[in-house]
Amino acid sequence: MSNRKYFGTDGIRGRVGNAPITPDFVLKLGWAAGKVLARHGSRKIIIGKDTRISGYMLESALEAGLAAAGLSASFTGPMPTPAVAYLTRTFRAEAGIVISASHNPFYDNGIKFFSIDGTKLPDDVEEAIEAEMEKEITCVDSAELGKASRIVDAAGRYIEFCKGTFPNELSLNGLKVVVDCANGATYHIAPNVLRELGATVIAIGCEPNGVNINEEVGATDVRALQARVLVEKADLGIALDGDGDRVIMVDHEGNKVDGDQIMYIIAREGLRQGQLRGGAVGTLMSNMGLELALKQLGIPFARAKVGDRYVLEKLQEKGWRIGAENSGHVILLDKTTTGDGIVAGLQVLAAMVRNHMSLHDLCSGMKMFPQILVNVRYTAGSGDPLENDAVKAVTADVEATLGNRGRVLLRKSGTEPLIRVMVEGEDEAQVTAFAHRIADAVKAV
């Protein structure tokens, strides 16, 4: 990564009211982005958002900045991140902008850009936008100012797109599904997609009020979904996150099915159908069980850095079509250009229906290794914990003990001041102790 001032691994993100998520900054960001994007000739930008209360304020600021640079904005209203990527492609817009902090609490928000082809903006374009941010805002001539409009039935367009990724010859008739929309951007989309494909749907997390997004619901907290699946005696549960780019599932017994297992099911089904091209891409956090299960099927596996943009880069580098993070970002390049929770969930449902198998049974070919993750908050500017000699020594000792039957990974979060300590191995008690031992060393820095 280059030394960029504002853009992180997933756009610009922070606490609302604190720099950079302030009205004046976002107005200037809209202007700077408009100046850079206008060089490519198009004058149209798609703007979508999740259900955070701050989205109203930030979309107004963005639109004002874009208009000053001479670009027009088309609003989608609350819409999943992958829907904005899709609409950007279908409208041939110069870019799409999503106002969301994904799985974070309501008091955070962020700005993320898509290019004309529905993929994340290249680094050099983000750098050009940052360079424009250092200049004084100017305004185009009045006759050249941008306009604002709303996209008619944006939700309906995306619902039809999602349904189109599900095989025409299959139906969800007879399946009882609980879907948890995290009080986020999929609340008016996912239940309708599933119902229209024939499922009996129980929807939770579908009452957004601006401040309850991701609050004890959604892909980052599946406890409510697990409980509801058991109470309803449902066939499965589907949990999406606040902006709909992640999916975590729950089987009929209430067991959590994460992004690694979801990718395993989709990759294996692709192999069975003769549609798998190449291998599958995971990340440094992907479970060793996934790697071993894919190897047994003869499916090549590669690891990318953590972050869906790096999974996508690795897919493009290898010419493969399927990648995922264990957090639930699943990228299926034969269907879409970015992580799409609804579309990924539909492919798992298709495998269930086609094979007459439960979600639990579809997961049975993959044995998950115990993987313990401990997050340690650190103070920026107090030295790099990853370069500390004591931390390095403890880590090396743990790695030597695990040998080739486990892994240790220490990395910084791309969005928060956290060190993520991950230890993986065959014995859960052992890896838990090792993870906390390393975490204690990090805390002592």
Swiss-Prot record:
One of its GO terms (biological process) is peptidoglycan biosynthetic process. Pfam families: PGM_PMM_I, PGM_PMM_II, PGM_PMM_III, PGM_PMM_IV. InterPro entries: A-D-PHexomutase_a/b/a-I, A-D-PHexomutase_a/b/a-I/II/III, A-D-PHexomutase_a/b/a-II, A-D-PHexomutase_a/b/a-III, A-D-PHexomutase_C, A-D-PHexomutase_C_sf, A-D-PHexomutase_CS, Alpha-D-phosphohexomutase_SF. Its cofactor is Mg(2+). One of its GO terms (molecular function) is magnesium ion binding. SUPFAM superfamilies: Phosphoglucomutase, C-terminal domain (SSF55957), Phosphoglucomutase, first 3 domains (SSF53738). The active site is at S102 (phosphoserine intermediate). CDD domains: GlmM (cd05802). Its EC number is 5.4.2.10. Transmembrane segments: none annotated. Mg(2+) binds at S102, D241, D243, D245. The modification Phosphoserine is found at S102. Binds 1 Mg(2+) ion per subunit. It catalyses: alpha-D-glucosamine 1-phosphate = D-glucosamine 6-phosphate. Activated by phosphorylation. The keyword Hydrolase does not apply. HAMAP family: GlmM_B. Belongs to the phosphohexose mutase family. Catalyzes the conversion of glucosamine-6-phosphate to glucosamine-1-phosphate. This is Phosphoglucosamine mutase. The gene is glmM.
